[in-house]
């Protein structure tokens, strides 16, 4: 299909603040904000334009509506485990994004003279192509990004000078 093929962006969203739950409420309170574009649009768009499109899907009314739809599907399903918040995901093409950048983990002090953390990372990834995690911001405002790529995609991305100008491979 080439540049007309549609790519979906799934953005994990903590729905607690949208539905009035306490931020420490136990349980899985995650839904996905969904955005899509053709590959041609993605390739020709500026990063800021794509980011704005994704952020628009984080609007309160949209999150509440989509979460209510998901809750209704779960409620009506005979097998609650069969309900999938990414039902049409094609991991070879689509992107799943989760951001922990707002969490102030580097401000935490472990006490006992240990001080603040040197690094904050997500536990080992489940290998799922197209999965992206933005880690908590460091004290200087940097953000570590975890990407799950195929080996051949990784080999290509590290050879891309324009990409590597903005990042450093650490693992």
What is each model feature region?
Residues 1-171:
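Acyl-CoA-dependent O-acyltransferases
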